[in-house]
Regions:
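Acetyl-CoA-dependent GNAT
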Residues: 9-11, 18-95, 100, 105, ...
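Short beta-strand "wing" residues that participate in macromolecule-binding interfaces
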Residues: 85, 154-155
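Conserved acetyl-CoA-binding loop-helix of GNAT-fold acetyltransferases
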Residues: 101-104, 110-123, 148-149
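C-terminal "cap" of GNAT-fold acetyltransferases
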Residues: 136-140, 144, 148-150, 157-176
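Conserved GNAT acetyl-CoA-binding A-motif
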Residues: 125-138
Length: 176
């Protein structure tokens, strides 16, 4: 496995050609009005079509243009995972920067790739002198297991803009 920080010239639409985002979701976490959590039986499938792949590529380019970073994992020459960390500080004390993407191709999940990419983002966030990483994470069971095992907790301060985009996501933070 080869891990590296990408350059903007690496971000061509073909980079994501073989990336398989497909995932069957059977359970997802939900919050009750009183703040308690429960695991809800639910079924849906997530996948990216060609239009979404192009949007992701453009989103990653935008991350670069704003001074952010994109990290990738390759199995030989095939992209099998990527993570992006923005470079815009926010929060009441400008303590957060956002982990805007962390995705692993279907065939390579549960092999430690996500952990390595997340740790690369932690190192970069520390280099940038951030105090916390903000994550708008899928509420699906597998994503929550991952982020909680990495030490993420429900955020202390909601980013209203990000929340409005993803109201069913769990808004989390990782304290650096």
């Amino acid at each position: 496995m080869i891990y590296k920080e990408l350059k903007i010239t690496d971000l061509v639409p073909e980079l994501l050609n073989d990336f398989d985002r497909h995932e069957k979701i059977y359970r997802a976490w939900r919050l009750r009005d009183d703040g308690s959590e429960y695991l809800k039986d639910i079924y849906y499938e997530e996948n990216w079509d060609n239009n979404e792949l192009l949007c992701i590529c453009n989103e990653l380019k935008s991350t670069f243009e704003k001074g952010g970073s994109v990290f990738a994992a390759f199995d030989e020459s095939k992209l099998v995972g990527f993570a992006s960390l923005e470079n815009e500080f926010f929060g009441s004390k400008k303590q957060y920067i956002q982990l805007s993407n962390l995705h692993i191709t279907n065939s390579h999940r549960h092999k430690g790739i996500g952990k390595t990419l997340f740790n690369m983002c932690i190192d970069k966030a520390r280099e940038l002198k951030a105090n916390k990483i903000y994550i708008s994470a899928s509420s699906c069971e597998n994503a929550q297991i991952f982020y909680r095992c990495m030490g993420c907790i429900i955020t202390k301060e909601i980013n209203k803009k990000l929340y409005s985009l993803e109201p069913f996501d769990y808004h989390m933070e990782y304290i650096l």
